[in-house]
Structures are given as C-alpha cells and as structure tokens.
Amino acid sequence: MDSKFFIAFDLGATSGRTILGTLTGDKLTLEEVTRFPNQMLQLNGHFYWNIFSLYENLKKGLAAVAQKKVPVTSIGIDTWGVDFAFVNEEGALIGLPYAYRDPQTIGKKEEFFEKVMSADELYGKTGIQHMDFNSIFQLYTLKQRKDFGLTHASRLLFMPDALSYLLTGKMVTEYTIASTSQLLNPETRKLDEKLLEVLGVSKSLFADMVEPGAKIGMLTEDLCEELQIESVPVIAVAGHDTASAVAAVPAANKNFAYLSSGTWSLMGIETDGPVVNEKTTHYNITNEGGVDGTIRLLKNITGMWIVEQCLKKWHKEGTDYTYPQMVELAQAARPFACFINPDDPGFTNPQDMPKAICEYCARTGQNAPQTHGEFIRVIFESLALKYREVLDVFRELSVNPIEKLHIIGGGSRNKLLNQFTSNAIGLPVVAGPSEASSIGNIMLQAKAAGVVSTLQEMRNVISVNVEPDYFSPADAEVWNEAYQKYISIIKK
C-alpha cells in the first residue's frame, strides 16, 4: 500500500515544530523532525515576532525532512491568530510583525467603541469576541500612529500566510486565520467593507480569500536551489492553529464541546453557521471560521500561560521543574487555598507572574499561595472552575446536548488538570490528541490530496489512530462548593 507524506509546520506562541505525517491507508503516523523556540522580541517598549528567525527554522525543517528521502506530497502551516506582517510594493516584508501581547492596544478597544462604532454594532457585524489584541484594534492603533509599516504596505498578510508567502512567493488570505481578525462578516465569510472604511484601510491591502485545502503555490526555485530539494506544493490548511486542532477532534457526532488547551485555552462548540444574538453578545462569544463551512463558536480563556510564566520566573531564580514534577507538586498541595480569575487583565503580560497572583489575592481579600506547589494547584483549580463557568454558557447556546468535553492540544497531557476539569464540569472528559493542530494540518492536506473527502471522514481516520485518555467526574459536592466560592471571588 502506497504511503503519502505531508509536512506540517505547527507554530505556537512559544514554540514551533516540523512534523512529518505519513498516511498509509487509514494508518497515520507523526514524527517530530525539528522543534524550535518562538519568543517575542522586546525592543524599545514594544513586542514583536522574529518572522525571519521563524522562516530560517522552516528552512531547517525542510532540509531535515529532505534527509529522510521521502516523496513529500505537500506542506501546510498553522499559527496563532490575529497577528500580521506588512509587505511593500517590491514584495519585501516591512520590519517585524507586532506581537498580540504588545501594550500599544491597551485602552484602544474602548476608544474605538466610543469614537468609531459601538461594541454591540461591531459584534453584530463580525460575531467576534472583543479582545484588546484583535487585528481590528491593532490596525486602529497603527493608523492613529501613522505607523511606517501600515503607511508603506501594499499587502497585509496574517502570520501563516506571511510564512507561506516567504516559501512560495504567492500571497493569499486564508479564511480561518482571517476570521480571527474581527474584520470578517461571518455570514458572507468576506471582509466587511464598512469596517475597512471606518478604519481607513483599503480592501486592496488584503490578498484573495481562500478556503482550507486550497493550493497556495510551489516552493520557490531559489529556495529549492538553496536547500537542494524538490519543489512541492504549499497548501492553505486551516491557518489558525485552533481551527486545525478542532478539525482533529475524534468525535463521532455533534454532542460535544471542545477545549483546545495550550498557552491559550479555547472552549467552544461546532455549529453549522454563525450564532449572533443577544446571548452571544452578552457573553462575548466568538464565531471563528472552521473547516467544511463550520463555525467554531468559542470563548478565549487564558490557559497554561499563567503557569508557564510562573515557571519562567522560578527558572530565573534558579529552580526548574519537569512537567511531571510540576503536577506532583500541585497534587501534594492543599486544595482550594485561594482562587484567581485566569482572565484578569493583571495576568496578561506581567514581569513577575507569581507576584501578580499574590497581588490579585490581596485585592480580593484572600491569603496568597505560599509554596510553588500551591501556586500551581491554584492555577489548575481556577482554570477548571473557569472552564465550568464558560461551559455553562455553551450549554445555554448549544442546540445539541453536550455529553462530553474533548480536550485537545498540549494541555490534554495534564492528567491532573483533566481530572479537575471533569470534576468541575460534572461531565466525562476525553483527552487527546495532544498533537491536534499538527494532525488537523496534515489531514487537511490529505483532504486536499483527495485521500479523504469530508471533515467527518478526516475525524474517522483520526479516531482510528489516537488513543485518548478518559476521565469521569468525582467529588461533585466539594467542587460545587468550590465553584460558588470561585464565582464570589471573581466578582469582587
């Protein structure tokens, strides 16, 4: 039986990977070929992405796969959402893309609502959760500042599209990544021209929109000559990593919610079309583009970012923990010592995350955690309770009964948090695959190659190849009591 080989570049906000996927009949295998860091650059008070370093790492990934001497069918790239690069008339990138955690957009959302368009009107047009860093507020800020990049740009390319441009020389706007921008109409699946008009941004700044599965172009001759490799097509997968991840949920029907767990936690349900009404407006729910015409009705939640930043601070102080050690510390710590709201603005990008947690506790009249184990446990418990808070909203919004929660992404390997989550929500949790973005990326390339035809066929293949972990709810009374305390704290 012939095998097909696909390269997935899966780039997150803290690291990137080159994954070689091999599909032989229904058997899918993944091999991590390279892994590399992705860190925000801090320059003169701003935060940027080093897109040139990312491009170099893509080249290293291609060279490493070439050593394996397998016939590669295609390449796909997925990244985090909202951020973008500018390209000038000569086709050169202008500077470095701003990172979504850059402080320049703080307060701009409220200013936009006051001076340009109300929050409700903007939500009615886009169905997207209002967040400071959405592309629309980044562009609003850059326009006000007469930013050099925007002023001299011929094209705006979202991050996966910018990287595929560097590989192919072809420019596209992939639908799922564009849907994170808060510039698209979810009904027409096109850019909202009225929004572009009020921003003072020309529609010509954006390349043609393509759906997941479209061919972008071939690797450039120069690149192939430099790396001594054959040219292969680059496919527009679901460029938003969460869209690729949700496509990899091993579900047999629609009676589920999903949680894509990583630096960010994205919880939601899959719908056949956008849901924009009073309830979604009130709860600030987002309608992002999915595969095969679906909508990812979801809520962005601060995820493992808080614990990652605690680990970073402790590393500077000379203490390092492996993942199992971290979970062991949390398990041994006292339960429900205090509660935090993971989405509190104080946790967005502080210099010292443990200090930010202590300040939150002081502000809400709680005793702060005392040990590293307590800090970690407080974060995990608070995340689980946050998931219950948000899932209750989706129970209201879903036309289908929610019978289980599928946790996908790197955070699905955290068995303690998975159990806490099952306890908090009172539903079974199905955890895995942890490599959901890469698997979705690869299977969308397989779909483009004609190996599978539909999203459900993709999921059927994935189901055969993953062995998820199952968690059943326990200690209902204890967790219900903790939830009431959590709610009272976050309202302070």
Model-found features: residue ranges?
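N-terminal glycine/serine-rich phosphate-binding loop of ATP-dependent small-molecule kinases
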Residues: 1-95, 124, 224-234, 425-427
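Active-site core segments that coordinate phosphate-bearing ligands/cofactors
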Residues: 2, 7-8, 20, 113-126, ...
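Short beta-strand-loop/turn "lid" adjacent to the catalytic site in phosphate-handling enzymes
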Residues: 43, 63, 67-99, 129-133, ...
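Short glycine-rich phosphate-binding loop at a beta-alpha junction
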Residues: 71-79, 155, 208, 397-409
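Glycine-rich beta-strand-to-loop/alpha-helix junction loops that act as flexible
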Residues: 78-81, 212-213, 261-264, 404-412
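Pocket-flanking alpha-helical
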Residues: 85, 107-111, 245-247
